[in-house]
Amino acid sequence: MFHRPVLQVFRQFARCQSTDSLSAILERSMNKVQLLGRVGQDPVMRQADGKNPVTIFSLATNELWRSGENEVFQPAGDVNQKTTWHRVSVFRPGLRDVAYQHVKKGARLLVEGKIDYGEYTDKNNVRRQATTIIADNIIFLTDLRDKP
């Protein structure tokens, strides 16, 4: 019953304890992002020469905090808000098409995926950095029939 999970844990432990350089390459790591927010614009689908198409949209997340004394316990005080905008890219063929057809401005979504930092050259031949969330899963929290 526990043989398989124990073996997996032992293998991970053995990799961490080994001084072999190959084991460092096999070490587990994680790049996981979960965002809960609202869509800022209807998605667009882009396709670069010879590459797979991608659906892209922006997602806003908000942080709220109360300023003033006794921030946690007092209802008085100013409520502050910070909005962060995230660029979401969807490459998976089935999910990409669903996102393009059904994600709408104002919709509330839960997006799961990974964060990616990349570089590109703009039309003025200037190198730019771009951060994007590569979506693996999208959960619609707004009814697709509702207009947000």
UniProtKB/Swiss-Prot annotation:
GO terms for biological process: DNA replication; mitochondrial DNA replication; mitochondrial genome maintenance; positive regulation of mitochondrial DNA replication; protein homotetramerization. Keywords: DNA replication, DNA-binding, Mitochondrion, Mitochondrion nucleoid, Transit peptide. Signal peptide: none annotated. It comes from the Eukaryota. One of its GO terms (molecular function) is single-stranded DNA binding. Coiled coil: none annotated. Residues 1-17 form a transit peptide. Binds preferentially and cooperatively to pyrimidine rich single-stranded DNA (ss-DNA). Required to maintain the copy number of mitochondrial DNA (mtDNA) and plays crucial roles during mtDNA replication that stimulate activity of the DNA polymerase at the replication fork. May also function in mtDNA repair. This is Single-stranded DNA-binding protein 1-B, mitochondrial. It comes from Xenopus laevis (African clawed frog).
